[in-house]
């Protein structure tokens, strides 16, 4: 049985209007993966005799977007010779950041789209910082709209130098920089004949070489719970995605913060594991599973709890504890000061938190302190802060278990900040 191709999740980032949607559209169009709904519309319009034009497809995708329907994520799967690629999101989406952090899919790589006409813009930087904060290890850069600068190598080299400077200061190494015109199809899927001076990969070739994501099986078991079912004749069945470690039938698992809240261990033996309605003996990172636990009732656990082994239980931050975090403020109408109390979204948990201290403003590129104990922080700032949860929650330092160390901060229906847990301070 040949080994299945690795699945890789990618996100598209970059400044508004630099061509993210067009690039996604071109990838789907040239690989024959345009959403069914659009092909149907084309047929309904009786356009049979006319060629199925890229511009027309982009207009339909734009209409769907404006009606609030982004290209349905389910459609944006395509294959390269060595990879199954899923485009999990693109930042036109209001909940882009929250989805990237709490979504079922952590991105393995990001495609940063930069327009040759503009070069590096504020959002280019912000999205690059964000990719770094979210722990995205691999970046592919496209310098897009090359048709608008007459496919000029000098312009390409100039913008490429700007982007390289930005990404290298963020710690990215060895990333391809590809001159493209998504609108005309140059170097997205098909090699361009307009830029003989470029001999690197096309975008699809670069996507085909994204390193296979490693499965963190050696880390302690962590399964954030999405739902809990009570199934007749079986018992309590929590459902969630294994983030780290492995779960075997017969293991004893404990749930947190449930055990902390009820002041007694909520734990039991795993009697069975199921994935896609098939029984499993062992579940690994990335597996979405249901598992039956002896002696745990449906009322003991809920979404946001995390299952782990009893010898290395999930870390609970209680209301008397605090945690130190590095955050990047993405969108706040005024300024954040001590006492601000928004909602923290981490893995499947959502809990109110309070800003206890703002320790420092930092340079997001180097991590160096720019200002100690600032009075406030605002949109665009990176900072080291101390937060206190208003309800117990499982969080892990990002250096130990990154999957449970990243979070979004939301308020007023929008994502205010993204961050990562540096350390946890236990209160007495």
Curated annotation (Swiss-Prot):
Naturally occurring in which organism (per UniProt): Pyrococcus horikoshii (strain ATCC 700860 / DSM 12428 / JCM 9974 / NBRC 100139 / OT-3)
UniProt-annotated stretches for the region G1: 14-21
Principal location: cytoplasm
Gene designation per UniProt: tuf
Keyword annotations: Cytoplasm, Elongation factor, GTP-binding, Hydrolase, Magnesium, Metal-binding, Nucleotide-binding, Protein biosynthesis
The protein's name: Elongation factor 1-alpha
Stretch list, region G3: 89-92
Gene3D superfamilies named in the record: P-loop containing nucleotide triphosphate hydrolases, Translation factors
Reaction(s) catalysed (UniProt annotation): GTP + H2O = GDP + phosphate + H(+)
Location of region: G4: 144-147
Residues annotated to bind Mg(2+): 21
Function: GTP hydrolase that promotes the GTP-dependent binding of aminoacyl-tRNA to the A-site of ribosomes during protein biosynthesis.
UniProt keyword annotation of Kinase present: no
InterPro entries: EFTu-like_2, G_TR_CS, GTP-eEF1A_C, P-loop_NTPase, Small_GTP-bd, T_Tr_GTP-bd_dom, TRAFAC_GTPase_members, Transl_B-barrel_sf
G5: region residues: 181-183
Record's keyword annotation contains Protein biosynthesis: yes
Residues covered by the tr-type G domain: 5-217
């Amino acid at each position: 049985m040949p080994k299945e191709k690795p699945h890789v999740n990618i996100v598209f980032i970059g400044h508004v209007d630099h061509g993210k949607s067009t690039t996604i559209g071109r990838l789907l169009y040239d690989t024959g993966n345009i959403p069914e709904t659009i092909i149907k519309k084309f047929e309904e319009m009786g356009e049979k005799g006319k060629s199925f034009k890229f511009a027309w497809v982009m207009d339909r995708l734009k209409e769907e977007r404006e009606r609030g329907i982004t290209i349905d994520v389910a459609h944006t799967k395509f294959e390269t010779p060595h990879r199954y690629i899923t485009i999990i999101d693109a930042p036109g989406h209001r909940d882009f950041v929250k989805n990237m952090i709490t979504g079922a899919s952590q991105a393995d790589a990001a495609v940063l789209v930069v327009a040759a006409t503009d070069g590096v813009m504020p959002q280019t930087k912000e999205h690059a910082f964000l990719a770094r904060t979210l722990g995205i290890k691999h970046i592919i850069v496209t310098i897009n709209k090359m048709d608008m600068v007459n496919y000029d190598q000098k312009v390409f080299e100039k913008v490429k130098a700007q982007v390289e400077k930005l990404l290298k200061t963020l710690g990215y190494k060895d990333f391809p920089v590809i001159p493209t015109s998504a609108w005309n199809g140059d170097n997205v899927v098909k090699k361009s004949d307009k830029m003989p001076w470029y001999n690197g990969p096309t975008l699809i070739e670069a996507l085909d070489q994204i390193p296979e994501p490693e499965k963190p099986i050696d880390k302690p078991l962590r399964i954030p719970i999405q739902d809990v079912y009570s199934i007749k004749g079986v018992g309590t069945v929590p459902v969630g995605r294994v983030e780290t470690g492995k779960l075997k039938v017969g293991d004893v698992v404990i749930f947190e913060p449930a055990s902390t809240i009820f002041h007694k261990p909520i734990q039991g033996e795993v009697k069975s594991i199921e994935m896609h309605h098939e029984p499993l003996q062992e579940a690994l990172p990335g597996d979405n599973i249901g598992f039956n636990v002896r002696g745990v009732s449906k009322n003991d656990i809920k979404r946001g709890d995390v299952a782990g082994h009893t010898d290395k239980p999930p870390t609970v931050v209680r209301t008397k504890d605090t945690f130190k975090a590095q955050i990047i403020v993405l969108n706040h109408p005024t300024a954040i000061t001590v006492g601000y109390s928004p909602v923290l979204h981490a893995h499947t948990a959502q809990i109110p938190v309070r800003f206890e201290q703002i320790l420092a403003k930092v340079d997001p590129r180097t991590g160096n302190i720019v200002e100690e104990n600032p009075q406030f922080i605002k949109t665009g700032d990176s900072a080291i802060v101390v937060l206190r949860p208003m309800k117990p929650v499982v969080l892990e330092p990002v250096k130990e278990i990154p999957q449970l160390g990243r979070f979004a901060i939301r308020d007023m229906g929008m994502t205010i900040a993204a961050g990562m847990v540096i350390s946890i301070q236990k209160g007495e």
